[in-house]
UniProtKB/Swiss-Prot annotation:
InterPro entries, sorted: Class_I_gatase-like (IPR029062), GATASE (IPR017926), GMP_synth_C (IPR001674), GMP_synth_GATase (IPR004739), GMP_synthase (IPR022955), GMPS_ATP_PPase_dom (IPR025777), NAD/GMP_synthase (IPR022310), Rossmann-like_a/b/a_fold (IPR014729)
SUPFAM superfamilies assigned to the protein according to its UniProt record, in alphabetical order: Adenine nucleotide alpha hydrolases-like (SSF52402), Class I glutamine amidotransferase-like (SSF52317), GMP synthetase C-terminal dimerisation domain (SSF54810)
Catalytic activity: XMP + L-glutamine + ATP + H2O = GMP + L-glutamate + AMP + diphosphate + 2 H(+)
Gene3D superfamilies in alphabetical order: 3.30.300.10, 3.40.50.880, HUPs (3.40.50.620)
Coiled coil: none
Protein name: GMP synthase [glutamine-hydrolyzing]
Subunit: Homodimer.
Organismal lineage: Bacteria, Pseudomonadati, Pseudomonadota, Gammaproteobacteria, Alteromonadales
Gene: guaA
Domain Glutamine amidotransferase type-1: 8-207
Disulfide bonds: none
Annotated GO MF terms: ATP binding; GMP synthase activity
Length: 525
């Protein structure tokens, strides 16, 4: 088997919102890469031994005195370097070129660049031909500053009407700079440019594939764990489910999964988890029915942050109790994924800001004397899903809309009661079922129902009823950082509303949330 980490790209992060996207694109090409902060040491780079380095974008201005710079070793390491946006500007400035501050003439959004010179990076790539017979590329720009003079040894590869150096290259040293963003889908041939860089220029083999990743993970788990036993908190979500399947393949019945039913799950979800992992896949699962314990702990509490913390604390207490019963367990498995690792590194340097407290299993007791097993910590979410498919998990489960860790605890507004959860479960199930029937489920990024703790008058037959209100929420988004409300057809919404009001005793009104993010968040709490 080829070592999936033999060939690799190092991406240095200067703070761009697109940096993780670069890493995901390189991984999609089949090449392993890691994302590090820009201020790494020469020793760290040497130890990582990348086949190529990408300098990502960032919000700073190269013209500012204290703006970040690439380590000098990047340009003497003898490996290809690709600078993207800010990365191109700092490369240019550090190698003797010049960058000028943009004054009212930056480029933001769609642009067309004209190729002036042949380059390995743009080999056989074009979107159109200019009047003068030169290749044109549709790209996505997002810059104020621009390179005004390229370093010695570089040639101009592409330009736009307002940007004389939209791409530059030193083919001898294999240094390349692009002012646009090849990692975003708006740059139509962007992935091919990154393929040229990773596969042709850096000479990486495309070994980073789901089957190889699984093989490598299982081998490493066997070496790490040996004959010991492992305990895993299985939620039925994507990450913990894939961890469970990997560990089951690696160590079989030496894995104990603890599934805590907190009473805040979707309709029939607890039974589905037990059926799939227990009956179908044959995993060793401890099912803890803790609905009353969670609801009792939250009684009278209406504050969303407080509810999240209570749910987290009760889970930790239960998991701690169950782990003590597994007297031979030496290892605790977690579904940590690569963005969690990046985020915690960011918060360690003070660059990350928490908007809502995270509800991962990261809050487990410090005094659990176990080693930590994190088989997904190198993987992005889309990679985890692909691995799940390869391991035999159903598509519908892996590509289901996101569900918050606290579950219905943050979809019942205010105080959480069993009655509210039961009504919400039924309403949400109808909404999701109708989305599937209308072939709309995969056309929206996330859809769910929210329980509002207010009563509204309704008319049923000859009588009036005074019952609860639910809100439907559906959004379209690429990255969940911003989102538009989904323009679902009126007749569809009418059908969902009719079914909820007619089939669920206790709900008298259905509303549809048409708030975007920002200013609203996707979840109500």
């Amino acid at each position: 088997m080829n070592n999936i980490h033999d060939h690799k790209i190092l991406i240095l992060d200067f703070g761009s919102q697109y940096t993780q996207l670069i890493a995901r694109r390189i991984r999609e090409i089949g090449v392993y890469c890691e994302l590090w902060a820009w201020d790494v040491s020469e020793e760290q780079i040497k130890e990582f031994a990348p086949n190529g380095i990408i300098l990502a974008g960032g919000p700073e201005s190269v013209t500012a005195k204290d703006s970040p710079r690439a380590p000098e070793y990047v340009f003497t390491a003898g490996v290809p370097v690709l600078g993207i946006c800010y990365g191109m500007q700092t490369m240019s400035e550090q190698l003797g070129g010049k960058v000028i501050q943009g004054v009212g003439e930056g480029e933001f959004g769609y642009a067309q660049v004209e190729l002036q010179t042949q380059s390995e990076l743009f080999k056989s790539i074009e979107d159109a031909i200019s009047d003068s017979g030169k290749p044109l590329l549709d790209v996505w720009m997002s810059h104020g500053d621009k390179v005004s003079e390229i370093p010695e040894g570089f040639v101009t590869v592409a330009n736009t009407e307002t940007c004389p150096y939209a791409a530059m290259a030193n083919e001898e040293k294999k240094f390349y700079g692009v002012q646009f963003h090849p990692e975003v889908t708006h740059t139509r041939q962007g992935k091919r440019m990154l393929e040229h860089f990773a596969l042709d220029i850096c000479q990486c083999d495309a070994n980073w594939k789901p089957a190889s990743i699984i093989e490598d993970a299982i081998e490493r788990l066997k070496q790490q764990i040996g004959d010991d036993e492992v305990i895993l908190g299985l939620s039925g979500g994507v990450d913990s489910s894939v961890v469970a399947m990997l560990l089951h393949r690696a160590i079989g019945d030496k894995l104990t999964c603890v599934f805590v039913d907190n009473g805040l799950l979707r309709l029939n979800e607890a039974q589905q988890v037990m059926d799939m992992f227990g009956d179908h896949f044959g995993l060793n699962i401890v099912h803890v029915d803790a609905e009353n314990r969670f609801l009792d702990a939250m009684a009278g509490e209406a504050d969303p942050e407080a509810k999240r913390k209570i749910i987290g604390h009760v889970f930790v207490d239960i998991f701690d109790e169950e782990s003590k019963k597994c007297v031979n367990a030496k290892w605790l498995a977690q579904g940590t994924i690569y963005p969690d690792v990046i985020e915690s590194a960011g918060s360690a340097t003070g660059k990350a800001h928490v908007i809502k407290s995270h509800h991962n299993v990261g809050g487990l007791p410090d005094d659990m004397e176990m080693g930590l097993v994190e088989p997904l910590r190198e993987l992005f979410k889309d990679e985890v899903r692909k691995i799940g498919l390869e391991l035999g998990l159903p598509y519908d489960m892996l590509y289901r809309h996101p569900f918050p860790g606290p579950g219905l605890g943050v979809r019942v507004l205010g105080e959480v009661k069993k009655e509210y959860c039961d009504l919400l479960r039924l309403a949400d199930a109808i909404f999701i079922e109708e989305l599937h029937k209308a072939d709309l489920y995969n056309k929206v990024s996330q859809a769910f129902t929210v329980f509002l703790p207010v009563r509204s008058v309704g008319v049923m037959g000859d009588g009036r009823k005074y019952d609860w209100v639910v809100s439907l929420r559906a959004v379209e988004t690429i990255d969940f950082m911003t989102a538009h409300w989904a323009h679902l057809p009126y007749d569809f919404l009418g059908r969902v509303s009719n079914r909820i009001i007619n089939e669920i005793d206790g709900i008298s009104r259905v509303v549809y949330d048409i708030s975007g993010k920002p200013p609203a968040t996707i979840e109500w709490e």
